[in-house]
Amino acid sequence: MERERLVLKVTALQACIRGFLVRRQFQSLRGEYEAIVQEIEGDLGTLQWTEGWIPRPRFLPKKAKSCQTWKATGERAPNPEQELWSRFACKETEKETIREDMILKKSGESFTNASSLPCRDASAWSQDEQSRRTGKPSQETRDVSRKNDPEAAGPGLFHSQTELQELQNHRSHLAMELLWLQQAINSRKEYLVLKQTLRSPEVNQNRHEPSLCQEHGGQSCEKAGSQPGPPLEDQPYRGRTPGEPGHVDASCWRLRSQAHKFPEGLATPDKITAGAKYRDPSYRWPGPQLPTLSEYQATGKRLTKELDCGEEISGETCLQLTTLLEDESHKELKSKGSCPGKARTQLPTLHKDPNIEDNSPRGPCPKELDWQRAVPQELGVSEDHVTWDGSLAEHGGLDLWKNKPPKGQTPSDKSSIERSPSESSHEGWQNQRAVPFRSRPPEKLSTGSGHTGEDHWRGRQWKTGPAG
């Protein structure tokens, strides 16, 4: 029992202590709240606390505030007549405000000022009459005296006017800062736009500025520079200085750039297949052969080096180049020696069909004009300024060989070089077996300058069987 009593006493003491602490905390909060309201509003006339264990703040309207101020002044008055007069004035002001609110609700927004002025005049006239009868000042006289003497109106109104002036100054200051910030942003934008417009013409001018050739007297070579040029091995003049000779004109340059694509456009599919066939060592027959692909490449490279030393090429020099190539090929043929009789007699025979007669022996090919026309075209020679390209040297060996027609075609010329000894004149190419085939080399690779030691090939027939 004693323990229970002790516990009850302790809990009661703790409750008292907690209540004291809570009340003191609420008082401190109330003081802070009132300080904030006074700092904002200037006075605590509109603030009112509710009654109860936990008081709550409540703000009164401004009209009630005026009544409260009159009550405060009436309390200060020493005689009861002033207290009654203050109450009567508060009632009059309340009635007047209610009447004005009713009039404003009934009338429109456009007639608010016109409708409120007569009512105010009537109320002022009634107040004047009453003041004359009672000998007391009216509301307007009190308002005028309050404006003239701010100290009589109380310290709250004076503080509110000063704070209002400060707020107006702060507002104007903020407006000026915002205006300055906007102007700074606009000026920065204009500067960036101007900077971009000044840079763009310089870039375009540098990109489209034509390059000038010193050899052509300042003539612009913009067109030639914009076109895709040949690779580095076809342009040995790139490493030269501008003072060295060897600049070709624009037409030569364009033809050199087009010479890259020349073998692809010139060689037909038949020629390509024929060249691949003759490149294959399994298709080679014993006997005299034309220079190989590597020999043509070496000759083309040597000619390219000679031509790149600065000489411009004309039509006559092109013909001289072709004759030089032909002479070299003839020398190589002579070095290898003419085809002996034993080699000719040991040529592999074609498989013959017993039902087909051999009525078309191989005859000589007298078409020198065709070879004279074909050589300049296959070597890439034209009447304009043309340079010998290394790529043409690679493909030149392929183009000099005449290809075998496909199986489905019937040859139109009986004296063609491609015919085999075993083909028939009436059956065509269909019954012939596919045998590796080597065409006879051309009799003459010249341009009409003269016969150069290859006449022993002309007029001789190819022997297909063994000697005996």
Curated annotation (Swiss-Prot):
Residue span, IQ domain: 6-35
Record field: compositional bias (Basic and acidic residues): 139-150, 415-426
Positions of the UniProt region annotated as Disordered: 113-157, 202-245, 329-468
InterPro entries, per database record: IQCC
Protein name per its UniProtKB record: IQ domain-containing protein C
Organism: Bos taurus (Bovine)
Lineage: Eukaryota, Metazoa, Chordata, Craniata, Vertebrata
Originating gene: IQCC
